[in-house]
Amino acid sequence: MSCFLQVMNPITGQNSWQERGDDYDYHLEVANAGFGDMLHDWERNQKYFGALRKTIAGMREAGREVHVLDIGTGTGILSMMALAAGADSVTACEAFLPMANCAEKILAANGAGDKVRLIRKRSTEIQVGEDMPRKANLLVAELLDTELIGEGAIGIYNHAHAELLTEDALCIPARARCYAQVAQSPLAAQWNSLKTIANLDGEPLLHPPEQLKSCQGEAALHDVQLSQLPISAFRPLTDPVEIFQFDFQRKQEREKQRAQLLKLQSKQPGAAELVFYWWDIQLDDGGEILLSCAPYWAHPQLKELAAEKAKDHPLPNVVPWRDHWMQAIYYIPKPLQLLEAGKSFHLSCHHDEYSLWFDAREEAPTKSVRRHTCTCDLHMTYSRGRIGQLNQSPRNKRYLRYLEESIEAEKSNVLVLGNGCLLGLASSALGAASVLLHEPHRFSRRLLESIVKHNQLKNVQFLDKVEELEDSQLAALTHIFAEPYFLNAILPWDNFYFGSLLTKIKDRLPEGVKISPCSARIYALPVEFLDLHKIRAPVGSCEGFDLRLFDEMVERSAEQAVSLVEAQPLWEYPCRALSEPQEVLSVDFSNFGQEHSLKGSIELKHTGICNGVALWVYWQLVEDNSPRSIVSSGPSEPVVPGEFVKWDMFVRQGVHFPRKPKDAVTHLEWSTDFKPLLGELNFSFGQKKL
């Protein structure tokens, strides 16, 4: 049976009814649950198994029976490990019903169907005597996220110890330790604050208003693959320090709120702008089996891991890769200037039941530091990537070069399309006679209005809809400008909404009006990822257990609910180019309604497994042959087959993951079908050996 859902099309900006199976949400949740990523984490799997073997053997030697509770069992992998390690009984719970049903089949396929009691409930809903026959004396669980406590681990462990576990119960993992490292990074700071926009001579055009300067930002974590942040892009001001420890094994309740004040000394001068954060877990009671989520430069096993890898393997990628537990950046509300090495300061660390936040001050705070929130609209409206993009100097210079060469003082009348288009607003500061700013988003508009007021721009008018433009306003236009950027965009070409807006006013525009960007081109590049492909790759077997039923479930759901191309910040996920990029679509915004159906083939020029295809957009600001007239949302340096691609760090690219990558492939065949007025842009890819 099917149903109809109203879906926003980012290219047309229109809501449309789409037919979906009544189990679409189920398939979407299964495909995006992220279980596969965890199952590809070999270190996690081996160390959980090792901790189970060691702990159960120790309990056996002490003459104890072993009754295991597995909270959030997923595929049932930890329950099967516990059985293999010698547990007397295993009870597993899983509240996500599709996963629980799959776990039941996997347990049966591995001969454990009648040995594991599977409960389809949250652990906090389980009753001893009703759901499980006795309290467990060994808890194994994976309830952690990048922040450690963001999935509710504190409350779940507290309930388990109070209701489901014996007084002498052991836990895997036994405890966790959280670490912080204070740093300065002009690059990372761009993700958090707005810089002055200057012209090509360095003279200020737009200053951030006071409300932006005084805003403390959002306390929420910025999760990143911190090992991929170039070592030259930050200045560590302290060594990593332990800030909190969580004892999952103790019977005493874990506090839901704590504060830790650390007096630190700077290793070198700099501004305490941000905190790098990660954690490690001791899986066994003795603390011998350690799993660390540290970035490579702070990883306790860096030397051993580097020795095991090939010489051409990048050092940042020798540590075990995982996407479910990353590292995080927290931004200091007001950066603290540390003018000399050895300067003392205080790092204030806080957590509640689900999150953390930090502050840095010269003097110790006299009262608890409250969790800060955005008061300026910037952080609550835009993603970290978009904030960084607004500050991206090389990118901004290309737009400003076009505007400075194109805008005539007191003569140009400019229509700006897009959300938060500060560059378009800069045309007012460059002397345009008038600027019409299309900004229908309430908070984005409020932010831009504050910038207009602060910079005393007198010739700016805001619009909710382009259809509301009067004929006289359109007739006077000399320029239409966009980056383009729209809040609803996920994939780079979702910003083709610029073309849809132009179509609405196309017949009313004067001849000779200059449109920038004038065109856009989508490029495709076959690549070999070191690790990112694992998020969509089948697992097969894991630590000797057959998980093919899980693979089949995910594949069925992915076929129905996952786009053939998804958005990823590729700077965080190294890949080698297997060829040069090839254009797969060109769009002329003066004739946006034209449909396209194209095919082609890319010859692979470097040996490797094509486990991904990267796609991005080149925006052509003006029709000339200058590379300075192109703004790329893809590689930031020329692509060389066989070498790692350097990607733009402030925008996500499109990625296609082949379902079954093939060996000895010589060509990637592609096709593109674009129906702009319907907002349909579809790609297909195939691998061939010719």
Curated annotation (Swiss-Prot):
<comment type="function">
    <text>Essential arginine methyltransferase that can both catalyze the formation of omega-N monomethylarginine (MMA) and symmetrical dimethylarginine (sDMA). Specifically mediates the symmetrical dimethylation of arginine residues in the small nuclear ribonucleoproteins SmD1 and SmD3.</text>
</comment>
<dbReference type="InterPro" id="IPR025799">
    <property type="entry name" value="Arg_MeTrfase"/>
</dbReference>
<dbReference type="GO" id="GO:0018216">
    <property type="term" value="P:peptidyl-arginine methylation"/>
</dbReference>
<keyword id="KW-0949">S-adenosyl-L-methionine</keyword>
<keyword id="KW-0489">Methyltransferase</keyword>
<dbReference type="InterPro" id="IPR029063">
    <property type="entry name" value="SAM-dependent_MTases_sf"/>
</dbReference>
<dbReference type="GO" id="GO:0035243">
    <property type="term" value="F:protein-arginine omega-N symmetric methyltransferase activity"/>
</dbReference>
<keyword id="KW-0677">Repeat</keyword>
<feature type="domain" description="SAM-dependent MTase PRMT-type 2">
    <location>
        <begin position="366"/>
        <end position="690"/>
    </location>
</feature>
<dbReference type="GO" id="GO:0042054">
    <property type="term" value="F:histone methyltransferase activity"/>
</dbReference>
<keyword id="KW-0808">Transferase</keyword>
<protein>
    <recommendedName>
        <fullName>Protein arginine N-methyltransferase 7</fullName>
        <ecNumber>2.1.1.-</ecNumber>
    </recommendedName>
</protein>
<feature type="domain" description="SAM-dependent MTase PRMT-type 1">
    <location>
        <begin position="14"/>
        <end position="357"/>
    </location>
</feature>
<dbReference type="Pfam" id="PF06325">
    <property type="entry name" value="PrmA"/>
</dbReference>
<comment type="similarity">
    <text>Belongs to the class I-like SAM-binding methyltransferase superfamily. Protein arginine N-methyltransferase family. PRMT7 subfamily.</text>
</comment>
<dbReference type="Pfam" id="PF22528">
    <property type="entry name" value="PRMT_C"/>
</dbReference>
<dbReference type="InterPro" id="IPR014644">
    <property type="entry name" value="MeTrfase_PRMT7"/>
</dbReference>
<dbReference type="InterPro" id="IPR055135">
    <property type="entry name" value="PRMT_dom"/>
</dbReference>
